[in-house]
Amino acid sequence: VQEPREGRNEVERPPRLLIVVNVFNPDRGGGGAIFSDLAYGLVERGFDVTVRCAYPYYPEWTDKSGKNGRGIERYDDQGAHVERYGIFIPTKPNALWQRLLYEGSFLLSLLRSLPRGRDFDAVMVYCPLVGSVAFAVANKLVWRKPLWLNVQDLSADAAAASGIATNTAVIALLRGVQSWFFNRADVWSTISPVMVARLRALRRRDQPVVYLPNWLNGSMARELERLPDKTGRAPGSPVKLLYAGNIGTKQDLLRFCQTLHTSDAPFVFRIHGDGGRAEEIRAWIETTGDARFCFGPFLEEADFAAALHETDFFVITEKTESGGSFIPCKAISGLASHSAILAVCDSGSPLGHEMREAEPGPCFGWDALDAVPAFLARVAAGGEPFPRWQENARARAAFYARGQVIDRCAAALRVVIESGGDPAALRAGLADQE
């Protein structure tokens, strides 16, 4: 029997975790729903969680609370201690200088909290914002706390793919900076097998790379559970399509819409979202006057669930060579609603891998985009295996169940905390998670 340590309390305090991220509830786009749900789930599992994040701004790129600035707001949300820090919100999100100011402003804003870094047993930082990662690295250098890096997107690759950075020297510099910050972390995790392989090629200290997929957040799951199961329901004529989420350069959604517009395919396409290219889509739909297209704002969860229930296909587009780290996560809500997925992407991308593995619907390369209208005509005529896609979506949804993923994350976090960041202890403790 282990003897109690001198001065040890009969009831140990909960492990204290700091999560650093740019978006948090009420922001749902850009991973906000998942980041928030992880904090809530870890609180449920006995962690004392503090979240340092920006004021709500995404994907609209506007100060949604009216509080963004130099002030720090502190409050509790479902047991998590939330701290809001100011950030420069770009008016032109695809301009490189504005993106650099966006990243740098968040880093400087967060650095004000650095003296309180000793309060935590471990830090988890989410990337795509390198500014967040830079702060977490500074915290590690000062306080020597174990650092977990969760890579949702490779920022340098995303900047290149979206046209934010076009100069090869600038792109190389961004990748070098990204690699240096990444390799200060003790353990990495990411959201798809393709991303695991990419990260293993970037690591310099043999850090564990944990495959930890995202999941359907709890509140969205409850909204979908209120609706009847639509598995087995035949597609409509016209075929109902839904796109919902961020609308930026990486999606290349306008190109997809233009291809459908030039055809006489039988479809109705609802598009709901916001982001750097949303106004472009809205204006294009208004200009064309094509009644098959309908544009609306980012949907609240109840409305999103209803739209998923109504649609035949949930559409996900991913610009060629975009990396697409985030994109497979967009499929999770569609899978959970038992909707067939219509994807347009590179076959070797994370989304392409997901579509091959789960087969929840058709996957078109951009070079085969012209085949989509004829495909929709066949669907309307009952000539495609639509019920099988629905069944596959339902089967795959179980893989993204909230409880099992957060349980795995909580167990891995306890290993990280107990290891104190020791590389050998981390590799041994997380061997079954890689």
Over which residues does each language-model region extend?
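C-terminal alpha-helical cap of glycosyltransferases
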Residues: 210, 381-382, 402-434
